[in-house]
Amino acid sequence: GGIIVDGELFLGGNMNAGEYSGMFTEDEMSRRPALQFLIEDLAANGIVLSGIHKLSEQYRDDWPGVAEWVEKVAPQYNRLVNALWSTIDPQAIVFGGEMPKPLAHRLIGTTEFRMMRTARYGIERLFPKLIVSDLGGAAPVLGAASLPFKDMMF
């Protein structure tokens, strides 16, 4: 993942901001929303893919195992979304990378914001927008490629 604050990439004190896997226990690691585990579950259902790039290219929302995987990872996904909402208070959370768009929409459909909007002093708390990126797997490359230009021009 990545964190953008005021239009700038936030790297954190040790350059690892956005490494969300660290928030899960050892027992939860295989149930976190990581595409490598969906690929394993699909293989157990007879759909063998050689990697995440093939998942992105060939994805079908009706494959056996997809709905079960989404249900399995939903608790960890929701913890992640709620942790981001509670600690960073983002205006938006963007789903991108190699995740197929229909799968991103499925995950978004499981979102449960656990804290009430009026949790503090009667002030309405806004939910972040949940957005599916159009950049696909090119997002990290495009972002990295833009950094030298940003440093030169801005």
Predicted regions and their residues:
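ATP-binding/phosphotransfer module of carbohydrate and carboxylate kinases, centering on a glycine-rich
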Residues: 25-154
